């Protein structure tokens, strides 16, 4: 009895387990669906998404069927269940469901496109190859609320082009992204934007002029700086001489400079240098490239300057004392200017740059952000670069057009000069005939039959061309039958006369078409020609058309250059 009771208990528990439905974890899926639909029906997307905007405008009440959303690829990845989508959108702040729960629409009507859209958008380049929307949102989301992301792709391969546009909610957020995320690596190109800056590895004249103007301005600035430095050096020399003789009589800087004449003896200067070396023996050696200074200058540059000034003030502050203090101030200023030589100035600028870089890094660490090597700039700046690129493209295409027209004219002139008189009329008649198509001539077509598949069209033509001139070979690959068209009946007859030799070598059977067979074949020629002419052609316009023309000319020139030139004995 006990065993039976246990069995019944086990069966009941199993039934209960089966009856209990498995808990489906759809909370994250519902959140993802709501986020995706809110984005699709948001202001930022609808102003750019023409298809969805048209679907909303088509319906009178602005409702869109949920089945349309299910057809989108991103929604297919999340779910294909319309009821689940309706469940996810019940608490949405952007869209609302109809009474049946099968259609959705925006709660608020779509307004006009905002004017500050470009100012709120940033351009990003040097992105990783397999970049995604979620990656960009994660990186740029730390600077503000990302409203829209556009990643352009190549049509042929579908790979990302390496740059993207990120739209923020406010201008301040965009500026913050430019400040903190603009961190291009050292090996990155100097100029931003994926645009060519040269034509045939040479700068374009319009750009060259602007660059030359900039260089001239820089040169003028350098010359002015050099002049000011020279003037300061003169002031320093004069002031130093004045200070050294200040005990005898207080002098002005101009008097000191007059006293120093080029006729001064050279030996005392050498002695002075020796004294300097003896005095500064205990001190560390000065760096290479810096000017050696006299002991008087060193004394003046030492810290106890303010004491001298104080003494002068205490002594009564007479005119002599005031002049000395002025000279000291001038000397202080000039010596500091001299100490800051070009190398030191560069060092200062580098140190400032390092400080700024450190500050940025600190702020980045505060934000809790990883440093990613990206180049970020405003969309307005990128638009200016785009205009520059289009102007360059226009100029290069205009020059290409000119060169192509010149080459054509030259070739026409050459053909006219080489052609004998009266050949122009013959050429025009030939052109008319070619426009009409091949004219019916009897006894010109030879039918070739073979047991094995015939070789290529070129091989057949080469074999027959040894006997007489061939106009056309009508042959498909792998066929055992073909037709050869000759210029005159005599040429066709010559091939027929050599039939025995051809049969021995290639085992081909030849016959000239005549009667109904010939007429049918000529009709086939005309029908095939008409079908070929009526085929839809790819229309090439603008830059593509010019480039194809240039490519043809280049190929023709290379073929001409690669031809083997043979010289006769008399040349």
Curated annotation (Swiss-Prot):
Residue numbers bearing the Phosphoserine modification: 254, 257, 294-295, 335, 349
Listed GO biological process terms: box C/D sno(s)RNA 3'-end processing; cell differentiation; germ cell proliferation; mRNA processing; negative regulation of transcription by RNA polymerase II; negative regulation of viral transcription; positive regulation of G1/S transition of mitotic cell cycle; positive regulation of protein localization to Cajal body
Region span, Disordered: 1-25, 181-366, 411-432
Domain RRM positions: 120-198
Keyword Cell wall biogenesis/degradation: no
UniProt feature, compositional bias: Basic residues: 214-223, 352-365
Domain xRRM, residue spans: 439-552
Quaternary state and interactors: Core component of the 7SK RNP complex, at least composed of 7SK RNA, LARP7, MEPCE, HEXIM1 (or HEXIM2) and P-TEFb (composed of CDK9 and CCNT1/cyclin-T1). Interacts with METTL16. Interacts with RBM7; upon genotoxic stress this interaction is enhanced, triggering the release of inactive P-TEFb complex from the core, yielding to P-TEFb complex activation. Associates with box C/D small nucleolar ribonucleoprotein (snoRNP) complexes.
Record function comment: RNA-binding protein that specifically binds distinct small nuclear RNA (snRNAs) and regulates their processing and function. Specifically binds the 7SK snRNA (7SK RNA) and acts as a core component of the 7SK ribonucleoprotein (RNP) complex, thereby acting as a negative regulator of transcription elongation by RNA polymerase II. The 7SK RNP complex sequesters the positive transcription elongation factor b (P-TEFb) in a large inactive 7SK RNP complex preventing RNA polymerase II phosphorylation and subsequent transcriptional elongation.
Protein name as annotated: La-related protein 7
Organism: Rattus norvegicus
Gene (name only): Larp7
């Amino acid at each position: 009895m006990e065993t039976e009771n246990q069995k019944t208990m086990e069966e009941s528990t199993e039934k209960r387990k089966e009856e209990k439905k498995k808990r489906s974890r759809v909370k994250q899926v519902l959140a993802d669906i709501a986020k995706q639909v809110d984005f699709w029906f948001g202001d930022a997307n609808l102003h750019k998404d023409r298809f969805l905007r048209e679907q909303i405008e088509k319906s009178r009440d602005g409702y869109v069927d949920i089945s349309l959303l299910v057809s989108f690829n991103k929604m297919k990845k999340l779910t294909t269940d319309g009821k689940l989508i309706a469940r996810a959108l019940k608490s949405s702040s952007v869209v609302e469901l109809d009474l049946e729960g099968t259609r959705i629409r925006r709660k608020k009507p779509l307004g006009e496109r905002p004017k500050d859209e470009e100012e709120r958008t940033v351009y990003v380049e040097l992105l990783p190859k397999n970049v995604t929307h979620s990656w960009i949102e994660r990186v740029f989301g730390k600077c503000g609320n990302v409203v829209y992301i556009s990643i352009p792709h190549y049509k042929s391969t579908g790979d990302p082009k390496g740059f993207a546009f990120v739209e923020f909610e406010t201008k301040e957020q965009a500026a913050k992204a430019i400040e903190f995320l603009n961190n291009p690596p050292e090996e990155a190109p100097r100029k931003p934007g994926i645009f060519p800056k040269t034509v045939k590895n040479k700068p374009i004249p319009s750009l060259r002029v602007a660059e030359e103007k900039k260089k001239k301005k820089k040169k003028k600035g350098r010359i002015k700086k050099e002049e000011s430095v020279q003037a300061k050096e003169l002031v320093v020399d004069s002031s130093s001489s004045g200070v050294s003789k200040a005990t005898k009589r207080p002098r002005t800087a101009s008097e000191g400079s007059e006293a120093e004449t080029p006729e001064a003896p050279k030996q005392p200067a050498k002695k002075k240098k020796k004294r300097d070396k003896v005095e500064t023996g205990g001190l560390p050696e000065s760096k290479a490239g810096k000017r050696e200074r006299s002991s008087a200058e060193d004394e003046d540059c030492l810290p106890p300057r303010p004491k001298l000034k104080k003494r002068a003030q205490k002594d009564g502050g007479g005119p002599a004392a005031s002049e000395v203090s002025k000279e000291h101030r001038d000397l202080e200023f000039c010596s500091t200017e001299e100490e800051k030589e070009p190398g030191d100035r560069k060092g200062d600028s580098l140190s400032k740059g390092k400080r700024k870089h450190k500050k940025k890094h600190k702020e980045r660490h505060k934000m809790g952000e990883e440093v990613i090597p990206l180049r970020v700039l405003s969309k307005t700046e990128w638009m200016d670069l785009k205009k520059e690129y289009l102007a360059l493209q226009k100029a290069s295409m205009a020059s290409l057009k000119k060169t192509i027209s010149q080459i054509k004219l030259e070739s026409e002139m050459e053909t006219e000069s080489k052609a004998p008189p009266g050949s122009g009329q013959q050429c025009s008649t030939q052109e008319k005939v070619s426009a009409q198509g091949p004219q019916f001539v009897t006894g010109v077509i030879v039918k070739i039959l073979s047991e094995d598949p015939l070789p290529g069209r070129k091989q057949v033509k080469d074999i027959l061309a040894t006997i007489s001139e061939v106009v056309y070979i009508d042959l498909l690959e792998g066929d055992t039958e073909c037709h050869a068209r000759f210029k005159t009946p005599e040429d066709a007859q010559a091939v027929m006369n050599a039939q025995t030799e051809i049969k021995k070598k290639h085992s081909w059977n030849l016959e000239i078409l005549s009667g109904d067979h010939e007429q049918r074949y000529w009709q086939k020629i005309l029908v095939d020609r008409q079908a070929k002419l009526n085929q839809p052609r790819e229309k090439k316009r603008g830059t593509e058309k010019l480039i194809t023309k240039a490519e043809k000319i280049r190929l023709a020139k290379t073929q001409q250059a690669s031809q083997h030139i043979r010289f006769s004995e008399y040349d």
